[in-house]
Structure formats: structure tokens, C-alpha cells
Curated annotation (Swiss-Prot):
Residue ranges that the UniProt entry lists as topological domain Mitochondrial matrix: 86-123, 186-220, 283-321
Annotated compartments: Mitochondrion inner membrane
Keywords carried by this UniProt record: Membrane, Mitochondrion, Mitochondrion inner membrane, Repeat, Transit peptide, Transmembrane, Transmembrane helix, Transport
Additional comment: Plants overexpressing MPT2/PHT3;2 display increased sensitivity to salt stress.
GO biological process, one term: mitochondrial phosphate ion transmembrane transport
Protein name as catalogued: Mitochondrial phosphate carrier protein 2, mitochondrial
Originating organism: Arabidopsis thaliana (Mouse-ear cress)
GO cellular component: mitochondrial inner membrane
Function in brief: Transport of phosphate groups from the cytosol to the mitochondrial matrix. Mediates salt stress tolerance through an ATP-dependent pathway and via modulation of the gibberellin metabolism.
Amino acid sequence: MSDSSRSLIPSFLYSSDHRLFQATTMSTHLKSQPLISPTNSSVSSNGTSFAIATPNEKVEMYSPAYFAACTVAGMLSCGITHTAITPLDVIKCNMQIDPLKYKNITSAFKTTIKEQGLKGFTRGWSPTLLGYSAQGAFKYGLYEYAKKYYSDIVGPEYAAKYKTLIYLAGSASAEIVADVALCPMEAVKVRVQTQPGFARGLSDGLPKIIKSEGFRGLHKGLVPLWGRQIPYTMMKFATFENTVELIYKKVMPTPKEECSKPVQLGVSFAGGYIAGIFCAIISHPADNLVSFLNNSKGATVADAVKRLGLWGMLTRGLPLRIFMIGTLTGAQWVIYDAVKVLAGLPTTGGASPATALAPSVSA
């Protein structure tokens, strides 16, 4: 690749000393050990070996392997965390849908135990796992791609000057696609969690919605979902990136590159939790709306406002959601960055001020 086809990208957008990825002669560098032997069936007929890189092998920044690693990390971070908090999600959704019956967290917990037993807290786990795994893959993978792509378009000077706009534009672009993947599973999840007897889970809930409402029934909540998730994700990524940068500049006594990996992952959790609090507040009215529309056949936005009230739309279930989303977002960034570290990549955010030479992302 010629110099003209490469672009200088401000390293604040990516949290590494780029020399870690460009140096080819390091006395401490371990030899690459492919997971798949070149003598086995992974070698194609033309002699090309398709080996998966081990953690000791170098992954070039912004290469296809880099974006693939970020996609897998995003899939794991969102799928695992959202499934783990299914019990809290059950309580939250029921409080949003039927505030007269589920008046607060305590009464919602007691009512669920009384009517459904402990099993009631696991309702909807399978569509949650599948839906948010798909969403996480697109969200994080496309965010990293879009962040690099928009930086290439504006150039290093404007990317440095308007870095927060890069974060916002990249995260919004990624979330638009990610929600299309999430929406069908979200529709099934809400029905299963808030309508006892509707279905046992994904296997019978999905066909039931398709039979009664057609495939449109799986996507009727897409626009409200965008209304909830796009502001949420923009806040999540922009706040996280800036918070982590601030922590390394103002709080940590040593530069990021001198901090141990556990310390860096701790910073990722702190930045994620702070970002999650802001995410919960800005996206909560739309979250109430999504739950109401997915639970009520033929319901409109006006019906939701009339039933819940404007104040209820803003506050119903908010304390629980702040705790849930704060913990969730912090854990997501830890898992995401841990997977990147295992792949030999840097954690996200808080880079040193040096610039890095990196391949351009083609349109």
C-alpha cells in the first residue's frame, strides 16, 4: 500500500502505542503458533492456509482481523450481560406495562414470585441472548469501522478537533443497523416476559407472533427502538470515550501504557458505569414506549402516554434501570476490552497523544 493511500489517524481515537502493532523485531516477541496446522485440511487446494491467529500473533490495527475481533468481542459483551440481568429486566418490563399491579420493585418481585415462581425471572432469556448477541456484534464492529471511516474522511486535524462528533456519528450509524437485528427478538422477549401464558420462550413465541400479526409484528417496534437505542448508544460511546480519556489524564498517576491490564480493565468498567447512568436517563422514555407497544396489540404512542402519563413515561422504573444499565454498561466494556486484550489488541480509549500510521478504510 502506497503512502498516499494511508492516513494519519489521531491516536486518541484508539488506545494503543502503535509501535506494539508495527514492530517486527522485539526480543520479547514470541513466535507465532497457528492454531491450525498448515498440513491439515485447513489448507485450500491452491495452497492458501486459513489459520486463526493466536493471542501471541500480531493483529494489525484496522485490518479485517481487527474489525472481526471487535465484532466477536461486541457479540460476547452484549449477549452475556443482557442475558445475565434477565431477572431485573422481567421486573422492569412488568413495572412499565402494568404500574397498578407492579407498583415498585419490591411488589414486582413479590408478585412475580407468587404468580410464576423463580422460573418467572428467567422468562425471555433465549430471545435476549440471541437478540442482544446479534445487536452487540453489529454495534461494536460497525462502530469501530465507522469511527475509522469518518476519521479518514475528515482528516487528522478535524478528527482531533471534533473527536466527540466522530464518536457520536460512528455510534449512531452502527446502532441503526444493530437494531434491525435486535427488533424481532425484542418483540418476542417483551411478550414472553409480560404476558404469562403467551409462550414458554422463543421456540413457540416467535411463530405465535408471526401467525397472529405477520412478520410486520416483529418489527412494529423498530422506530421506537431506534428512539431508545440510538440516543442511548450515542451517549454510551461518546461518554465512555471521553470519561476514560479524562480518567487517564486527571485521575491515574501513571500514563495508560504504563498501567497493568487489570488496571486498564478497571478503568473500562468505571468509564462504562458512568456512561451507563447517562444512557439510562436519556433513553428511558423510549424504553417505556417500546415495552408498551410490544405488549399491546394495535397500541399507539398516544395510548402509551394516556396510560402511563408523561411523568410516568419519564420516571416509571427509572431507578432500577439506572442500576441495571450502569452495571450492564460497565460489564460490557470490561468484557469487550478483555476480549480485545486476549486478541493482542489495546483497550478502548485514553490513548497517548502520538499519532499512528494506519491503513485507510475504503468506502
